[in-house]
Amino acid sequence: MSPREQQLRQRLEARFAPTLLTIEDESHLHAGHAGAAGGHSHFRVTIVSEAFRGVSAVARHRLVYAAVDDLLKTDIHALAIEASPP
């Protein structure tokens, strides 16, 4: 697990106490892409949390982005999100 993936996991676990959290590093799919410089920059997150109950899909994405905002500005180029309540 890369340091970026560890940071991402720690942030999401602390903020959402998920019942399910999977993080896939998809950086290898973007080799040669300008945003892929340095590797470990493209991630797919699947997260299930009670915090998402009654929250629209757009709002769930905003919550996830807010939890990792500083990482998106510096280390993570792309984040695909599947967020849902249990």
Name what the model sees in each region:
Residues 1-2, 86:
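Absolute protein N-terminus
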Residues 2-36:
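N-terminal first-folded block
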Residues 19-21, 43, 79:
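Conserved beta-strand core positions
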Residues 24, 46-48, 82-84:
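Solvent-exposed beta-strand sheet faces enriched in polar/charged residues
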Residues 31-49:
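A short, structured beta-strand/loop element
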Residues 53-86:
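C-terminal structural segments of small proteins and small subunits
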